[in-house]
Amino acid sequence: MKQERYSVLSLNLGKPQTLEYDGKKIETGIMKRPAKSAVMLYRENFEGDGQADLVNHGGPDKAVCVYPAEHYPFWEEFLSRPLSNAAFGENLTVAGLTEENVCIGDVFRLDEAVVQVSQPRQPCVKLAKKFGVKEMVLKVQQTGYTGFYFRVLEEGRVSPGANLELLSRGEKGISVQFANRINYHDAKNLTAIERILSEAALSESWRASFMKKKDRLLPVE
C-alpha cells in the first residue's frame, strides 16, 4: 500500500464552557484552543479536553473530532468573517484528509497513538449557537462538510505537529462523504444502507440509526 501522510495543522483542546444564546445559557465543549505541547490521547478523549453533552458527543466511538482545513475558506465566505483553527470545535484540524477521501474503518498512526475512523460528525445546534447562524446545521448537512470522528485503538502521546500516517483502509471502502449522502439525502436507498451496515468499524450510534432506516424500508410481514 502506498504510504500516505497527512498534516495535523492544529491540535485543539478545551473543557466545557458556558455560552449564552437567545437569552439562554448552554454548556458546550465546542470552544477549543490550540495546544502548545504534547498531550496523552486516551480511549475516550485527549488529556485536557472534554465534552458537555456526553450523550451526543465523546465516548469511545467519538474520542477525537477531526475537521478538514480545506473547508475553512468556504465557511469564511459564508459567515463573512475570518476563522482560526478549532473554529468548529475539532480536536484535529487536518490538511489533505477530507470526507471524500477518508473511509470508515481507515486506521492511522497519530504520533504514538493509533486511531480509526468511526463515523461522520453529526452537526448539532451548538454550531449554530456558536456562530449565531440558525441555518448552520442545515448548511453543514447540505455541503457534507461535517468532519468525522476517530476511535482510539492504541493510546499514546500526541504532539501538536504530528502527522497522520495511513496504516490500513476500511474493509468496505465506504467514504465519510458517501455515508453523509445516504444519511441526509438518500435515506431510502436500501442497498446503500446495507452496504454501510456491512462495515464492522461503523460506530454503534450510526449503526443503530441506519438499522432503523433499514427497518422502515423492509416490508411488514
UniProtKB/Swiss-Prot annotation:
Q: Name one GO molecular function term.
A: pyridoxal phosphate binding
The MOSC domain is annotated at 33-167
Taxonomy, superkingdom? Bacteria
Write down any Gene Ontology CC term.
cytosol
Pfam families reported for this sequence: MOSC, YiiM_3-alpha
Recorded protein name is Uncharacterized protein YflK
Which organism does this sequence originate in?
A: Bacillus subtilis (strain 168)
Which gene codes for it? yflK
